[in-house]
Amino acid sequence: MPSRLLVSLVLAGVLAPFAIFAARDAAYHFGPRKPGAAENLVHLTLGASQVLFIVGAFRANLAQELLGLVSIAVFGVIDEFFFHRDLPPAETDLHAKAHMFLFAFVAVALALNHLPPLLTSWPPSWSAS
C-alpha cells in the first residue's frame, strides 16, 4: 500500500487543476455574470460538499468521501438543472473543465485510498470459493 505522504502528494497534484478552474469559475461570477441569492446559496453548499469530499480524500475516510459525493451530486444537479441553462460559452467551458478535473480527483482519490486493500486481499472475501 502506498504511504500516506505519497498518496497526499499525488492527491495534491491531481487536485491543483480543479482548484484552478473552480477559482476561475468563482471569479467569473464577480464579472460577466452575477448569480442571484438562490444560486449563490447552491454554490456555497456545493463548495462545502466539495471541501467535505476533499478533506475526506486526504484522510482516506470513505464515509466522509461518500457523504461529500452524494452532496456534490444532489447540489450539482440542482445547480446545473436550474441555474446553468444558456450560459455564455466561456462559463460553460470553465464548468466543463472544473467538472472534468473534479471527476479525475474523485477517481484517483477513491482508487488510491480504497483499491489497494482490495487488490492485496484477492480474491475478495465476498467471492465464491
Predicted region positions:
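Helix-coil boundary and interhelical linker segments in multi-pass alpha-helical membrane proteins
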Residues: 1-13, 51-67, 105-128
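N-terminal signal-anchor/start-transfer transmembrane helix
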Residues: 9-29
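C-terminal ends of transmembrane helices
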Residues: 22-34, 77-89
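Interfacial loop at the N-terminal end of multi-pass membrane proteins
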Residues: 26-48
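Non-cytosolic membrane-interface motifs at loop->transmembrane helix junctions
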Residues: 35-39, 88-97
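Core segments of transmembrane alpha-helices
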Residues: 42-55, 98-106
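Hydrophobic alpha-helical membrane segments
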Residues: 67-81, 98-107
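Alpha-helical membrane-associated segments of multi-pass integral membrane proteins
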Residues: 91-109, 128-129
